[in-house]
Regions:
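Acidic, metal/cofactor-coordinating or nucleic-acid-engaging core segments within structured domains
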Residues: 3-15
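Composition-driven low-complexity segments enriched in polar/acidic and proline residues
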Residues: 33-228
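Extended hydrophobic secondary-structure segments that form protein cores and membrane-embedded regions
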Residues: 23-31
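A general structural signal for short secondary-structure junctions and capping/turn motifs
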Residues: 15-21
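Short acidic loop-to-beta-strand element that houses the catalytic metal-binding Asp/Glu
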Residues: 1-2, 228
Length: 228
């Protein structure tokens, strides 16, 4: 409705104009644990259940609640949605636990995974049904999904401490990001200029070498300003 009609009708025939929305992401929240389904979307695409253009993020209520307790920035959540619904991640990485993906994201590795897959993939993943012949049409060669290792040890320790099951104090997991860039994102957020949410997510999504370059540039700005 948002992408096609640029809005929706509310009660009493009131039109909600959403033409200013620039980015739309689909979420499917389930009461039951759905990790095998949510982390292996490629089979749903191959079966024709969903298309590749708007892959939803399928998550259980429990995992979403855990993520909401950790995440404190809407821009970070938007970046995570971008990563989890990108075909390069959805089709080439697999795990039985959604929180493995989220912890990998907090470590900055999921963003790196996304860049690596985009850079190395000359062709998109093969989404054609398997007819048993070993020949697939139109979508490139099939590649087995990379199975993620468990990344939830620190998360488990924090949850146990928060719930009173452990006396060992553990810091809440946080996104790895340079302090200078954190301050820049915070300033953009405070000003609430048009596009601040997407711009902040773009900054969070910078590769490590890009982060270093930007930090270096920000460090030099005061001296350059004095010269001018």
């Amino acid at each position: 409705l948002i992408t096609v009609n640029s809005g929706v009708w509310l009660d009493h025939q009131q039109w909600l104009d959403l033409s200013a929305v620039k980015e739309v992401r689909s979420l499917v929240v389930c009461l039951d644990e759905v990790s095998p389904l949510s982390t292996d979307l490629v089979e749903l695409v191959r079966a024709g259940v969903m298309g590749v253009d708007n892959i939803p993020w399928i998550v259980s209520m429990h995992d979403l609640m855990v993520i909401s307790e950790i995440n404190e920035d809407p821009a970070l959540f938007l970046l995570y949605l971008r990563c989890r619904t990108d075909p390069s991640v959805a089709f080439r990485l697999a795990s039985s636990d959604e929180l493995d993906f989220y912890m990998r994201f907090l470590m900055g590795l999921l963003v790196e995974d996304l860049e690596v897959h985009h850079r190395l993939s000359a062709r998109p993943p093969d989404l054609s049904p398997d007819d048993g012949s070993g020949v697939h049409g139109g979508f490139g060669h099939r590649r087995p999904a990379q199975q993620l290792l468990s990344h939830t040890d620190d998360l488990d320790a924090w949850v146990y401490f928060e719930q009173g099951h452990s006396e060992v104090a553990v810091e809440k997991p946080a996104f790895h990001f340079p302090e200078q860039l954190q301050n820049l994102v915070a300033k953009i957020k405070r000003q609430e200029i048009a596009g601040w949410l997407r711009a902040s997510a773009d900054l969070y999504g910078l590769q490590q070498d890009q982060q270093r370059q930007l930090v270096n540039m920000l460090t030099k700005l005061p001296a350059l300003a004095k010269r001018s």
